């Protein structure tokens, strides 16, 4: 056992292995620090929004680090409910709550199966649920949606990025009933498929799970949703389901909402058009929520520098919410550009914004044809420059 510090919290954890697996009885993954930073900031947003004490749930708690940080680092938690089916996890959680001197009336520790914990004990009672399963969150979504109060927030993590991003398309179809696209913006496609699934599962109960933030990092996706009720709100979300048609030859892409408007061939090069979806084609970021996360993170010393850097990038990205983005190196390779310009220059050239998904990725409102035309223009300018340089 060893003691580690994260944020303000200190916790006892088993010795951290090089490889994390679901077979471990209790684990603490230091690589998920940014994820937990975001969960704390998301809860603080809810504190400010509601202006009252809140109840939070961590149904797959493991070491208890999330629930402990929620109690120590936010301003409104009345009580945190930490749950894990592992008896070893329960022992470690108890030690960790004591280690941080948290009063016993501010938390409860339970050892139930996560769905049972969410449904049986506190139906419609939680203001904030942080769900961080090992793998897909699908088996827990309905229980989470039913356990939350109206206006509550779900902080959701998914680590099964391989199926969602196209490595295992059949698995993606079974779990999410959608086709992934293994292209340069495959992780965004995966996030949009996951959002669609969350909305779909909650919609069965006339619950609207409205996406307000999306983030892709390392091996996981991080999403936030606000819970609302009413068939009109649910229908409005479902209206924002659609498909992406993509050409793997020329990188052309089109968003389609009408099944009758599918194209078999790419109108740009004539190659086969592939289909991704159904998926969410609406906004990935609520500007108010995203701006709050960024601004709150800058004020806090306990928040990682990496978290602050990522939030700055996402804050800028949220100003231009396209479906899909372009990767400069892929475009440069396609048109045989003599020299790839720095991404900061390319962003200005395309009137776009950088994306957090890929280091040299950018979003733009320009059409695919306009993007390729500007790439050809850039190519000609570079050729002229190199020719002049050659001539002295």
Curated annotation (Swiss-Prot):
Q: What is the effect of changing residue 179 to A?
A: Strongly decreased tRNA guanine-dimethyltransferase activity
Q: Which terms under GO biological process does the entry name?
A: tRNA N2-guanine methylation
Q: Which reaction does it catalyse?
A: guanosine(26)/guanosine(27) in tRNA + 4 S-adenosyl-L-methionine = N(2)-dimethylguanosine(26)/N(2)-dimethylguanosine(27) in tRNA + 4 S-adenosyl-L-homocysteine + 4 H(+)
**Stated consequence of mutating residue 266 to S:** Does not significantly affect tRNA guanine-dimethyltransferase activity
Asked whether the UniProt record includes S-adenosyl-L-methionine among its keywords, one would answer yes
The impact of changing residue 250 to S is: Does not significantly affect tRNA guanine-dimethyltransferase activity
Q: Which PANTHER family match?
A: N 2 ,N 2 -DIMETHYLGUANOSINE TRNA METHYLTRANSFERASE, TRNA (GUANINE(26)-N(2))-DIMETHYLTRANSFERASE
Against HAMAP family, the record matches this protein to: tRNA_dimethyltr_TRM1
Q: Which family does it belong to?
A: Belongs to the class I-like SAM-binding methyltransferase superfamily. Trm1 family.
This protein is called tRNA (guanine(26)-N(2)/guanine(27)-N(2))-dimethyltransferase
List the taxonomic lineage: Bacteria, Pseudomonadati, Aquificota, Aquificia, Aquificales
């Amino acid at each position: 056992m060893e003691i580690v510090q994260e944020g303000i919290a200190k916790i006892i954890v088993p010795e951290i292995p090089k490889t994390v697996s679901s077979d471990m009885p209790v684990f603490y993954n230091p690589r998920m620090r940014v994820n937990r930073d975001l969960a704390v900031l998301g809860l603080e947003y809810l504190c400010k929004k509601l202006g009252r004490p809140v109840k939070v749930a961590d149904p797959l708690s493991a070491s208890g680090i999330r629930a402990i940080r929620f109690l120590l680092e936010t301003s409104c938690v009345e009580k945190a409910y930490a749950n894990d089916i592992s008896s070893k996890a329960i022992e470690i959680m108890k030690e960790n709550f004591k280690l941080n001197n948290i009063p016993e009336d501010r938390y409860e520790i339970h050892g139930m199966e996560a769905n049972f914990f969410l449904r049986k004990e506190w139906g419609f009672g939680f203001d904030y649920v942080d769900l961080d399963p090992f793998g897909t969150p699908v088996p827990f979504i309905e229980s989470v949606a039913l356990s939350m109060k109206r206006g509550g927030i779900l902080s959701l993590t998914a680590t099964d990025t391989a199926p969602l991003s196209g490595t295992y398309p059949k698995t993606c179809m079974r779990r999410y009933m959608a086709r992934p696209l293994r292209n340069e913006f495959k992780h965004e496609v995966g996030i949009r498929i996951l959002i669609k699934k969350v909305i779909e599962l909650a919609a069965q109960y006339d619950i609207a799970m409205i996406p307000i933030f999306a983030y892709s990092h390392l091996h996981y996706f991080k999403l936030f949703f606000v819970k609302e009720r009413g068939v009109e709100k649910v229908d409005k979300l479902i209206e924002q389901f659609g498909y992406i048609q993509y050409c793997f030859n020329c990188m052309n892409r089109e968003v389609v909402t009408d099944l009758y408007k599918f194209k078999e061939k790419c109108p740009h090069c004539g190659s086969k058009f592939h289909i991704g979806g159904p998926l969410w084609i609406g906004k990935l970021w609520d500007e108010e929520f995203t701006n709050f996360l960024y601004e709150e993170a800058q004020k806090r010393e306990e928040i990682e520098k990496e978290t602050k850097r990522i939030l700055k990038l996402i804050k800028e990205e949220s100003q231009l919410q396209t479906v899909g983005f372009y990767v400069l190196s892929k475009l440069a390779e396609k048109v045989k550009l003599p020299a790839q310009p720095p991404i900061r220059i390319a962003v200005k050239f395309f009137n776009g914004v950088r994306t957090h998904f890929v280091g040299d990725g950018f979003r733009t409102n320009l059409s695919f044809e306009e993007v390729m035309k500007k790439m050809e223009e850039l190519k000609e300018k570079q050729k002229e420059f190199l020719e002049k340089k050659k001539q002295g």
